[in-house]
Amino acid sequence: MAKIALKDVRKVYGGNVEAIKSVSMEIADGEMIVLVGPSGCGKSTLLRMIAGLEGISGGQIMIGDRVVNDLEPSDRDIAMVFQNYALYPHMTVRQNLAYGLKNRNTPKEEIERRITEAAKALEIEQFLERKPRQLSGGQRQRVAMGRAIVRKPAAFLFDEPLSNLDAKLRVQMRVEIRRLQRSLATTSVYVTHDQMEAMTLADRLVVLNAGRIEQMGTPIELYEKPATTFVATFIGSPSMNLLAHGAASSNVSAGWSVNAAAALPPTVATLGIRPEDITLAEAEPADAAFAGTVQVDAVELVGAESYVHGSFPDGTTIVFRVPGRSQLRIGEMLKIAAQAKDFHLFDAAGKRI
């Protein structure tokens, strides 16, 4: 186990394409960090740089008390888990688990002990004599994780390991990964584009945007206090509603308004409201900080609740949550409201106020 530290790490391609822009972070010993962001944000590149699969153009990477900039991946004391499993098809599960240890001349008794421990933790004991083709996708991913676990590395690096699994199995596997990581207390860096996966797994999240860290913090910190409009719309599903706060916000014809009593700062350019913080109203309540009349465009039933997609007369769209199985009709007009305590305020640059 070891901490990981990045200081002003950069990656430049072709002399002028900067993929990673002076990224600095410290990952504590035993911490689970999740790198999340849209395609092309640099999360996989950053993981590969930590692993040594991608060279760095500047800065410093430390694993434990060693600077690893110039070390080969095999010398960094890390273990990686990929989305494509990377198992040897002609070997049994037991042989796959043992392969890396044999190459390191680990004693036979120690190999067997580690395989037994990992197989028990991953519940794959009954599959040890099978070959990968005889396993399901979830079982193969457990074996891939087992191969990383038996190495007892200083850190685990996960590169979108659940991407090939169906939705139900992804939920099951991410819970298992979190349970295992906590029990092993091994420093871990996990890459995903799935913000729900990120929220479930992370001790802290790192949201990346165009090669930069947009915000780093616990899942609840990023959800409740997004630093920018980018984070506000990326973390949370459905996304936070962002409304342009200007002349239209006091224009009755827009179909929505902000009560003057809310006393928003003059620097507010964008008003953010989470879907769950918007309520239906019989009439526009006098004490509501935000109120409006919206047309129902679509209703998304997700089980115990529904999400209503609507639009105001000025064309502004909004999403809000209603409990239960909604009987709302497409085209129906509804009155909605929200309180000032639930507002997220951003300036013209998209920064939180």
From Swiss-Prot:
GO terms for biological process: carbohydrate transport; glycerophosphodiester transmembrane transport. It catalyses: sn-glycerol 3-phosphate(out) + ATP + H2O = sn-glycerol 3-phosphate(in) + ADP + phosphate + H(+). One of its GO terms (molecular function) is ATP hydrolysis activity. This is sn-glycerol-3-phosphate import ATP-binding protein UgpC 3. It is found in: Cell inner membrane. GO terms for cellular component: ATP-binding cassette (ABC) transporter complex, substrate-binding subunit-containing. It comes from Agrobacterium fabrum (strain C58 / ATCC 33970). ATP binds at G37, P38, S39, G40, C41, G42, K43, S44. It is a peripheral membrane protein. Its main location: membrane. Its EC number is 7.6.2.10.
